[in-house]
């Protein structure tokens, strides 16, 4: 569904699927004709720092590919509901991620949050960070280069307290220091509903 929605809504010339191990199964066989496959070797380390978890290896691969080619990166669970063409004139785009406690749990909160969404009144203390599940980038974007350079301080060993440091917190710090190199979209642009129980 995610791949089909990306194809139908955005109508790209090609959809590149970067992988180390090719998926299998009925749904993969249905999606495969939509894709241009690109087999990669996931890095064991980057900038002299070991990458222990597959998610962190994937984080580095997506940034390296965007640096080399530019384009749109979407996680495999991203469902496109609107085309992204209108955003392609920016050097780099990333969306904010709400803290899980700010996901509406009932209809009253949904109305309240809808009003905030329309008026742009999302408070900064409600934003968890930036999320790398959907990224748009020009080739060799200055922001991608800055982000990749921060991996010299990468320290996560897996699902530890540094798990999302480089995927969520580092980019928001970079964006604060280099607002001219990045376009930030609100939390409802790419990352809603959230990954918590009510969102799922």
Describe every region a protein language model picked out:
Residues 1-58, 76-200:
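Glycosyltransferase-associated regions of secretory-pathway enzymes
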Residues 59-71:
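Small-residue hinge/turn detector
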């Amino acid at each position: 569904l995610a791949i089909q929605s990306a194809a139908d809504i955005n109508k790209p010339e090609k959809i590149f699927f970067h992988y180390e191990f090719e998926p299998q199964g009925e749904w993969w066989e249905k999606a495969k004709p939509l894709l241009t496959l690109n087999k990669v070797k996931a890095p064991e380390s980057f900038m002299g720092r070991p990458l222990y978890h597959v998610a962190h290896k994937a984080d580095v691969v997506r940034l390296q590919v965007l640096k080399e080619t530019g384009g749109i990166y979407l996680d495999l669970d991203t469902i496109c509901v609107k085309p992204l063409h209108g955003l392609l004139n920016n050097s780099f785009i990333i969306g904010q991620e709400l803290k899980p406690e700010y996901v509406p749990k009932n209809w009253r909160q949904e109305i309240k949050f809808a009003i905030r969404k329309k008026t742009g009144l999302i408070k900064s203390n409600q934003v968890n960070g930036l999320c790398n599940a959907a990224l748009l980038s020009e080739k060799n974007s200055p922001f991608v280069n800055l982000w990749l350079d921060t991996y010299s301080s990468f320290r996560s060993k897996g699902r530890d307290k540094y798990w999302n440091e480089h995927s969520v917190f580092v980019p928001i710090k970079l964006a604060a220091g280099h607002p001219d190199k990045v376009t930030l979209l609100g939390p409802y642009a790419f990352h809603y509903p959230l990954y918590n129980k009510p969102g799922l």
